[in-house]
Amino acid sequence: MGHPIKTLLGVALPGMVLLVGAVACGTREPAAAPVVAAPITHPDLSGFWNLDMSVARDDDLMKQVAPNTAFIDDTGPKELPAGDFGGLQLKPAALEAARKWDPYTQLTPENACKAPSIVYAMQGPFPIEIFQSDKLIVIKLEYYDMVRILFLDGRQPESDYPASKVGFSSAHWDGATLVVETTHLEPATITNNGLDHTADVRVIERFKLSPDGKKLLATQEFADPAILENHGVRFIAWRKEAGQHVFPYECDPGFAGNYTKPTAKKPK
């Protein structure tokens, strides 16, 4: 019977015999197992969230607000009266337009169901529902059936991306905080009393969970240099409620007929 090395290779040199023998005897060091990084996990914001006006402002979120920013305290059903813009410093043309505001123009069949932009809608007294994945987050508002898509993959809007009331939102995680930047918004109200933002408004939102995960906390900061000398910010909080979903808004423009502008009485 021939040598097994010769039988396998045909010809075996002495060095080759030693090498193969070493392999056969198992003296080679085993390869190190590859190091697998732990998957990055982020807070789960998904679920049904109802507005909660009892939550105090979050100090960590408020510290990230830019200087020269007015805090607008109108979250929920609260409305600022005419002429009160929550500390926002209006430029002359914007102030003049706001002074001409007539609330009854909103209470017409053609305007009664006109949706605001997210600048005003996010703080409204209606719940939201969040669906979350690694690529995007969807926020469904009950208010005016608005749906927001927050892209997490780094994409940017095309040059001809259309403006809308929800705009284009790109998002990223900063630790446990979701940071969202929104542009491409159609002009719409800021304070529902005559002050409208332009199509160039830029909105920065930060979302985080409370330590117990039962509250969703957010700031909404916006800048619109065409009409404002400073920035504005709102603080908004929601509480999580299991087994709930947002309802259709179903705005009926007919309700505008319940509101008519008072007419001056003719002198007798």
List where the protein language model places each region:
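N-terminal secretory signal peptides that target proteins for export/translocation
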Residues: M1-T7
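Classical N-terminal targeting signals for secretion and organelle import
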Residues: H3, G21-T27
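PEST-like low-complexity, intrinsically disordered acidic/proline/serine-rich tracts
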Residues: C25-K268
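Bacterial N-terminal signal peptides
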Residues: G10-A22
